[in-house]
Regions:
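Conserved Radical SAM active-site core
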Residues: 1-159
Length: 159
């Protein structure tokens, strides 16, 4: 990653409904999208759950992996859950750099699966950022938010 404060980024969720005008992630995802299924600001409940990687074919017949097959529509890339196990040991990993993992539209089940994947790959430092810090509190109160030294939580300013 080119982000100076982490060694790696890992985005098992991509996409967001905040519609921030300065969002680099939205621009990147839309540049490499496969198709349009939801527009920015559309219903905050529309999400996609992918079990395996998709490929897209462009108008010239070239097929490629689709990192963001649905643009910036919130998408859970479940096939990426084992990625931290491949990153060696002792890395600082920015989790969901291409999404707000704690947005109100993200199903709790997705969050739990990501925390479980982090726990299954110990020895890293996992960094989480959100514009919805209330979700941290809700998950903590529900006994879901991990509190070990390897889990770091922060917030981004809301619009």
């Amino acid at each position: 990653t080119k982000i100076e404060w982490c060694d790696s980024s890992w985005s098992p969720i991509t996409g967001c409904y905040h519609a921030c005008p300065y969002c680099y992630a939205r621009a990147t995802a839309n540049r490499f999208k496969g198709c349009d299924i939801a527009e920015s600001g559309e219903a905050d409940t529309f999400v996609v759950d992918l079990k395996e990687r998709l490929k897209v074919t462009n108008k010239d017949g070239v097929t490629r992996n689709a990192a963001y097959p649905f643009g910036f529509t919130p998408t859970f890339h479940e096939y990426r859950l084992d990625d931290p196990k491949t990153k060696g040991f002792g890395k600082t990993i920015f989790v969901c750099s291409m999404a707000d993992m704690f947005g109100s539209w993200v199903p709790e089940e997705w969050i739990v699966k990501i925390f479980d994947a982090c726990k299954a790959a110990p020895g890293h430092r996992y960094l989480f950022l959100t514009k919805n810090p209330q979700r941290y509190i809700d998950l903590y109160n529900a006994g879901i938010l991990p509190d070990g030294d390897e889990f770091w939580y922060g917030r981004m300013p809301a619009l």
